[in-house]
């Protein structure tokens, strides 16, 4: 499994959580960090952010020379439209037969993370079109679908409707 996420130095999220879980499940995991943050973006102000976009394609190029393919590619935090486009390329390069899983990390509690422009959900929706499995929270789902965010609790019918609309993305 290739896990493509950020590394948040503080906070229970991103690669620092995904890698131990996958490893404990006996799954060999390769990591590809998209950014390094001093903390995650939820609830912290003044965090540092180092974008690793410039490193992603050279890493992918090296893997391509080694004919590395993955059984699954799992994405989390992607920090830009450019990273979304690069990951689409990586789906083709390293995962033609792979299960493609996208967690469109970009929002919580009805709010897009401050780091992202208002139109970012449309870019993330374009990546979800290429995925076999998408795992948004309710905020992310409604943003990608262009629907208003509604506070829970949620009915079974509401969740089913959201899921059907997400499935129609691709």
Question: What is each model feature region?
Answer:
Residues 114-170:
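Conserved phosphate/ATP/ADP-binding segment of small-molecule kinases
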Residues 1-102, 106-114:
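Conserved N-terminal subdomain of the carbohydrate kinase-like
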